Amino acid sequence: MSFDTSTYNEALADAASILACRLPSAERPFFYLHLGAEYDLAGFFDAPPAEIPLHELSPSLPRARTLDGEETRLLAGRIEGVPVLASAGARRVADGHGALAALFPTALASIMGVKNHIFLDTAISLVSEFKAGRWGMLADYVSDFAFSPLEGLHGMLDKPFPDLAHTIDQSQNSEILNAKADFGEPPRLCIYHGIPGFHLPTSAEAARSRAIGADFLGHDLVLHVILSHALGCHVSALVLAGVQLLPGFPRSFTRDEMRETGLFCSGQLRQGLRRAILEVRRASEGYAENILPESDADEVLCRNIKLSATRSSPLKAFLRREPPTQEPT
């Protein structure tokens, strides 16, 4: 079986009911993380998460493994005490099962009320600033897909014509940037260019992406970002430079090389992401450190050095006194 837009809503509703019964906690997840096959997930969660193969939530979902040889599955657990739902082994449109199947986890998290989304992907760096292993954070993106992930899904949207000018949530981005700065070099803002397929690009494709201002060249990330924002979610996206493809330096590389970079950088990602999730949760709850009220410095000093009227200062003997003035006779 496969999806069409007329049955997509019903399939999502059924999957949400099944998933709600299988979550380890009755508390609704606060975060949704979308992870590719490149990252080592050991230690991401406070304890081993519950794992649910995605195809068990709907008969219309494919059972076949992804092009990376992964089984797409949902992980449910806690990170720094915050309930999180994650999708691991992301399926891509190029797998051949359609965009609706690839986007199913993102849409499912949205309709379940999980409104804070972070997407992670490994892509090809096109500029010298992003060396292999360097993280970027999406400030904007360009999509070359011939279709929109919203086609036929307008019944799910609050607005049939969503404004994509502010897709990325800058407030959430700030919390993530600050958190990751404590664990190495913070990610830099970047422009992501998404193209169809799942291939390693030609030099001409890379040059065209640079010409439109892109820092990274990748694939399906843009589709998830658009759908998530259109469904009313707070969206952030981190992209890792798996390899670097610079002008004038043509080179050959493999998908395995990109995956190795992702595995190598998983530790830094894990530390920064755990802190970021906690900080975003605190910010959403209006958490703030206790800040002392402003005081006048003179009043503070006076209050702290004032002597009791019943006690004398041990320095009293050293006080200078002016001699008494004598009135003229």
Name every feature range the model reports, one short phrase each.
Residues 141-142, 146, 151-198:
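Histidine/lysine/aspartate-rich catalytic loop segments that bind and position anionic ligands
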Residues 173-174, 178-215, 280-285, 289-293, ...:
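Active-site/ligand-binding-proximal alpha/beta "capping" segment
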Residues 283-328:
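A short, charged, Gly/Pro-tolerant segment at domain boundaries
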Residues 108, 208, 225-227:
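Hydrophobic/aromatic ligand-binding patch that stacks against planar heteroaromatic rings
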Residues 220-258:
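Zn-dependent metallopeptidase/amidohydrolase metal-coordination segment
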Residues 115-116, 215, 234:
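Short acidic/polar active-site loop segments enriched in Thr and Asp
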